[in-house]
Amino acid sequence: MQTLHVELGERRYPIFIGSQLDPKQLLEPYIHGQQVMIVSNVTVAPLYLSHYQEALESLGKTVATCILPDGEKYKDIQHLNLIFDALLEAGFNRDCTVLALGGGVIGDMAGFASACFQRGVYFVQVPTTLLSQVDSSVGGKTGINHPLGKNMLGAFQQPQVVLADMAQLNTLPERELSAGLAEVIKYALLGDEDFLVWLEENMDGLVARDADLLAEAVYRSCAHKARIVANDEKEQGERALLNLGHTFGHAIESYLGYGTWLHGEAVATGMVMAADLSQRLGWISNEDVARTKKIIQRANLPISCPQIPLDDFLGYMAHDKKVLNGQLRLVLLKQLGQAVITKNFDVELMKQAILANQHG
């Protein structure tokens, strides 16, 4: 087992990464009250819920559960209310813990519920997908979608602890595994060319679910995110770099309908668009764009999206949270392994990059 820490002063917390982790031993120091609400979904609960429920009950905790439907399209205010209903019906109080057992949707919703319930209760992350292990479970961003934009309602709510168990990735559908690899590739492109080389050498093993390689990829990804979050928790500066590919990707997700494409699939094509625009601006070479596309394709991810009317695409981009004083800011590549956030780009070139990476 490997351990990382997100350094946030008094709110410092560990990320435990390994295979067949012992929840009783690892969770005991971080469950402060007697009441635990496990939030999961209909896919994950039959696989792992009893394991965590029994571990917590053996610690003398009162455990209740809230099982939600599975999918991004349920990340809305109606289903968030189901978590509040469960907490209130169980009679839970301000020293309870909300434990997220699932992927990014469950983590986002359970975290947001924990931030809101009685103005804030304890929160624990047990991410069961690769995407949530390397990205959404670390850093405290929580929230739900609104019909007009993704993640428009939310709060920063740091967990007490994160448990990333590689064994849980064995039950992950191939498409979900690939979606997680998109976020892994993102870390390499935005800040670590050595990691990109490592991914190029080991992508076949990652796709084949080699546990040691997956653990290394999760560790390196989380180390990048932990460092950035420690420096910029509320996304005032450097943390925005973690949105490489996301402004384009969120537009794709929003237009196609939440859940039609997985988040990681949209981010993958979004990173291709960002690389394409970076090349059009003269910052990276055609070879760099080709290299970006190749590693994304080797992870079984899309490098283009279905045709989306340009006005619709731009309309969704205008709702992006990185818009500042009415100006869209994008995360682009100065070179592979070095990203910048900028408002200094030619909008016509951006339109060309969007249109060039769509298919009929």
Curated annotation (Swiss-Prot):
Tell me the cofactors it needs: Co(2+); Zn(2+); NAD(+)
| Gene Ontology molecular function terms on file | 3-dehydroquinate synthase activity; metal ion binding; nucleotide binding
The record's keywords, sorted A to Z, are: Amino-acid biosynthesis, Aromatic amino acid biosynthesis, Cobalt, Cytoplasm, Lyase, Metal-binding, NAD, Nucleotide-binding, Zinc
Where along this sequence does the record place binding of Zn(2+)? E183, H246, H263
- EC no.? 4.2.3.4
Catalytic reaction equation(s): 7-phospho-2-dehydro-3-deoxy-D-arabino-heptonate = 3-dehydroquinate + phosphate
Q: Which GO terms describe its biological process?
A: amino acid biosynthetic process; aromatic amino acid family biosynthetic process; chorismate biosynthetic process
Amino acids binding NAD(+): 70-75, 104-108, 128-129, 141, 150
What's in the GO CC field? cytoplasm
Paste the cofactor note.
Binds 1 divalent metal cation per subunit. Can use either Co(2+) or Zn(2+).
Q: Give the top-rank taxon of the lineage listed in the UniProt record for this protein.
A: Bacteria
Location comes to: Cytoplasm
User: Hey, which pathway is this one from?
Assistant: Metabolic intermediate biosynthesis; chorismate biosynthesis; chorismate from D-erythrose 4-phosphate and phosphoenolpyruvate: step 2/7
- Which PANTHER family is this protein grouped with? 3-DEHYDROQUINATE SYNTHASE, 3-DEHYDROQUINATE SYNTHASE, CHLOROPLASTIC
**Function description:** Catalyzes the conversion of 3-deoxy-D-arabino-heptulosonate 7-phosphate (DAHP) to dehydroquinate (DHQ).
HAMAP family per the record? DHQ_synthase
Family, per entry? Belongs to the sugar phosphate cyclases superfamily. Dehydroquinate synthase family.
Q: What protein am I looking at?
A: 3-dehydroquinate synthase
Look up and give the organism this protein is from: Acinetobacter baumannii (strain ATCC 17978 / DSM 105126 / CIP 53.77 / LMG 1025 / NCDC KC755 / 5377)
The upper taxonomy is: Bacteria, Pseudomonadati, Pseudomonadota, Gammaproteobacteria, Moraxellales
Gene symbol of the encoding locus: aroB
